Regions:
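Ribokinase/PfkB-type carbohydrate-kinase core domain
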Residues: 1-37, 44-236, 251-291
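Internal, well-ordered alpha/beta segment that forms a basic, Gly-enriched binding/recognition surface
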Residues: 248
Length: 291
């Protein structure tokens, strides 16, 4: 089994803030002045990890699946988007910088004659443009046995929800690529789930896994989850859940067990370390003994 992971390397920079520096307004909402004077430090601790493609690669590799990555600089630490995450007690806020570095999609990896993959896995971080989508579609059309898994985050929901009839031909490249998907992960509100199901209903062989703030839903199965580590933010949790479920499904776990493994992984992982398959299997046996 060989998987090509397509996504960006994203650096999360966590700043732990001291609650005493916050000011409360008349409505008891907390505010913090983040104008730095060059000398005063507003945070107690600083910690950073790589997410996006790199985290997805770790999760999938932990299932002993062979992987390659499409955004492949020699040193991924030097080519990534990044965001600050402000931590205070049990809450966090994401701050995206105005200017970020952009990773280059290594399309040559799909042009090699030796490039044979069982699955292409598009992480939510990929943010593909039309040229990149066309490259992926061309590869799939010339490799009909290669399957596609695709993760959509909240920012991509409008495009997904406005999809035309996916049973038709002559669609744009984005929707033609969607037609090829065997597994789709969608991160969104539970209220939007039925509309997503309706849009994708014509893709009869598709497995849809829907992830909300605290639930994983697929078919008749549902798993509630809770992030025990505040550094496992929404985006990190989505990467762990999607990567775990995908890996379990393609290594012959059934859907119910795949969702249970995803719940276990997201609840027991640290932001910089996820569980290996033997650890997941042990914790799954413990969970089944309790249920």
């Amino acid at each position: 089994m060989k998987v090509l992971i397509i996504g960006k390397n994203i650096k999360n920079v966590y700043l732990s803030l001291d609650a005493k520096n916050f000011e409360l307004d008349k409505n008891q909402n907390a505010h913090l002045d983040l104008v730095y004077d060059g000398g005063e430090k507003y945070y107690n601790d600083r910690f950073s990890i790589m997410t996006g493609q790199k985290l997805a690669n770790e999760v999938i590799s932990n299932f002993r699946i062979e992987t390659e990555t499409a955004f492949s600089p020699e040193n991924p630490e030097t080519c990534d988007d990044f965001q600050y995450i402000l931590l205070s007690k049990n809450n966090y806020i994401n701050l995206a910088p105005e200017f970020v570095k952009q990773c280059d999609f290594n399309s040559k990896i799909l042009e090699k004659r030796t490039a044979k993959f069982d699955y292409l896995y598009i992480d939510w971080s990929a943010e593909l443009n039309n040229v990149q989508i066309k490259t992926i579609l061309d590869y799939l059309e010339s490799h009909p046995k290669t399957k596609l898994a695709w993760c959509f985050d909240r920012s991509e929901l409008p495009k997904l929800l406005s999809a035309p009839d996916l049973s038709k031909t002559n669609l744009t490249t984005f929707y033609r690529l969607l037609q090829r998907a065997e597994i789709v992960f969608v991160m969104g509100k539970k209220s939007q789930m039925m509309r997503v199901k309706q849009v994708l209903s014509t893709l009869s062989t598709l497995k849809l896994i829907y992830v909300t703030e605290n639930q994983i839903l697929a078919g008749v199965f549902k798993e509630d989850f809770r992030n025990k580590d505040i550094k496992v933010t929404r985006d990190v949790a989505a990467t762990i859940i999607a990567g775990t479920t995908f890996s379990a499904l393609i290594t012959d776990w059934n859907l119910q067990r795949a969702l249970m493994l995803a719940k276990i992984n997201v609840e027991n992982s640290k932001a910089n370390k996820t569980l290996k398959i033997n650890q997941l299997s042990d914790k799954l046996r413990e969970a089944l003994a309790i249920r």
